[in-house]
Amino acid sequence: MTRTDTTSLTSRWDSALMRNYGTPPLELVSGRGVTVTAADSREYVDLLGGIAVNALGHAHPAVVDAVSRQVAELGHVSNLYIHPTVVALAERLESLLAVDEPVRAFFCNSGAEANEAAFKIARRTGRSRILAAENGFHGRTMGALAMTGQPAKREPFEPMPAGVEFFPYGDIAALTALVDLAPGDTAAVIVEPVQGEGGVVEPPEGFLADVRSLCSEHGILMIVDEVQTGIGRTGAMFATRRAGVVPDVITLAKGLGGGLPIGACLAVGAAGELLTAGQHGTTFGGNPIACAAALAVLDTIETDDLIPHVDRLGKIIAAEIECLDHPLVDHVRGRGLLLGVVLTAPLAKAVEGAAREAGYLVGATAADVVRLAPPLILTEEQVARFVAGLPGILDAATPKESTS
């Protein structure tokens, strides 16, 4: 017998892969819609969506068809040549941003890479300082990590690229004071509309507009990381649109490819002219297959009218979970289908495990926050079943008091 025949997939994972992910708890072999199937044939409702990636769920016909057609026609050419799909996607994203100035796109493979491009654009202004939010997350490559306001993620890899300073998320007074220390040397401010990895945290109302005004006053680039919030996730195509803000640079990934690896860095107006030939690049970024998938995702979101559906469904989920009045639930925060169930105790990992036992995939994004980021095609019926089962999940995650 071969090793494949005699050894479990988990054991093979432990032997063959680096330990940076630990050992995942499930062996998944297939998926359709909002449901995934494990190696033991058990099905799970995926309420995490590959961490906000699978905008249309698993094996969506539009994505499967677009990718199949494209890979059979032209799979990869590098950025030494032009192909129609990458131009079409850049033009489509520009039309969706719907701003008065021209928009230029740089395509890559992930959110971290999109934020690396934004970092370089900021430095091309000739200024060195980049201001980022405490508790923010922008990726694990070195430039993106330098802008990530979570010391535990940075410390193992120090020294970081220099010039990044941090302010409390949502505190415009603190940010203003930081800018005022050296406004002429401040290249950019980078923020997330909602801190997804940081616990699904929203800033105070008007914060993004205040950041925009501050940046405009001092000639500072406003970079908005919409890797997690973009492409309909919060009930708007871009979360910045809800705030009425036009950034200088916006970064995208996750839901854009519907499961295919693609990121985008979009630069508005003069910011789009800062990178010149030879200053940045990527071998696989913007390849025809990933671009075809992204166009299929955008088409489907529009034709199926998913954005108002996401906005409405998110409000239903939040209200119904809070109406359970369960002692382990404090409140629900977030927008659309990027929600954080805030617990009254640091039991998010236990809730994640109990949900898995009950047939649901959710994520612990903080010790006391359970993240929901399901496919945008989630139905009210699926929500109703989850909410009905949630009290049992929460009870199972709650430590039982000793009777001795």
Predicted feature locations:
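Conserved N-terminal phosphate-binding loop of PLP-dependent enzymes in the Aspartate aminotransferase
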Residues: T2-S404
